Amino acid sequence: MKVLLLKDAKEDDSGLDPYIQELRLCGLEATLIPVLSFEFMSLPSLSEKLSHPEGFGGLIFTSPRAVEAVKLCLEKDNKTEAWEKSLKDRWNAKSVYVVGSATASLVNKIGLDAEGAGSGNAEKLAEYICSKPSSELPLLFPCGTIKGDTLPKMLKDKGIPMESMHVYQTVPHPGIQGSLKSYYEDQGIPASITFFSPSGLKYSLEYIQALSGSSFDQIKFIAIGPSTTRAMAAKGLPVSCTAESPTPQALAAGIRNVLKPNHCC
């Protein structure tokens, strides 16, 4: 049974994307198609803020791209030595909040201690942050231009100061249309399609509708999280399942429950 995941590939130690591995255990043949590209912005401003941890109460990361922006700042501005010598430890003396295991892993790789990774989405992370003692200093929140309002609003309502800054913007992947066309020609109609973000849905849906034709209604549509579910509902797309958390295991469990493949894990 063939399933389509609209995301880019991330290799683990085995050289395979963990989502493909997990779905294979369930007897599902998964294909990944990237639908998003990212352009970084405001890096000099971010670099300046990273140099002054004393001005902030901590950090918030809700996407891997925001962590990549920090890594780029360290590399481009020759700050790696200063980061290793003192900046990293000064940030670690504060709270570094993250959503999801993928983001937490990248945060750990730049030497920071992540907390809140098990939250799974921005709303749950906001609840976690609100449950902790807060500083009078703002939390620094590097994010994309298309960020949800849930986390900032919840923190504001609780009187927790936060300074968000746009460090990347999301654009359509240049190969979306061609990759989807090739997939449909080679593999046919997938049993399910998983959307990993509202932006991914926005940039790919019209191509999927055109390529699927009269078979569109046969496809089971899956969301990686609540914000994607809301975006799908706004488009009138039936949501067969929302993963309980943005992890390979949770997504595989959701797809397995919807499709009930043979030889399932």
From Swiss-Prot:
Return the broad EC class.
lyase
This protein's pathway? Porphyrin-containing compound metabolism; protoporphyrin-IX biosynthesis; coproporphyrinogen-III from 5-aminolevulinate: step 3/4
Compartments where found? Cytoplasm, Cytosol
Chief localisation class: cytoplasm
Q: Which reaction does it catalyse?
A: hydroxymethylbilane = uroporphyrinogen III + H2O
Q: Which domain of life is it from?
A: Eukaryota
Carries keyword Lyase? Answer: yes
Task: Give the taxonomic lineage as stored in the record.
Answer: Eukaryota, Metazoa, Chordata, Craniata, Vertebrata
Renumbered to this chain, the signal peptide range is none
Subunit-level organization: Monomer.
GO molecular function (one): folic acid binding
Q: Which CDD domains match?
A: HemD (cd06578)
One Gene Ontology term, aspect cellular component: cytosol
Q: Biological process GO terms, please? A: cellular response to amine stimulus; cellular response to arsenic-containing substance; heme A biosynthetic process; heme B biosynthetic process; heme O biosynthetic process; porphyrin-containing compound biosynthetic process; protoporphyrinogen IX biosynthetic process; response to platinum ion
Which keywords annotate this record? Cytoplasm, Heme biosynthesis, Lyase, Porphyrin biosynthesis
Q: What does this protein do?
A: Catalyzes cyclization of the linear tetrapyrrole, hydroxymethylbilane, to the macrocyclic uroporphyrinogen III, the branch point for the various sub-pathways leading to the wide diversity of porphyrins. Porphyrins act as cofactors for a multitude of enzymes that perform a variety of processes within the cell such as methionine synthesis (vitamin B12) or oxygen transport (heme).
Concerning its family, UniProt says: Belongs to the uroporphyrinogen-III synthase family.
EC number(s) given by UniProt: 4.2.1.75
Q: Does the keyword Amino-acid biosynthesis apply?
A: no
- What protein name applies here? Uroporphyrinogen-III synthase
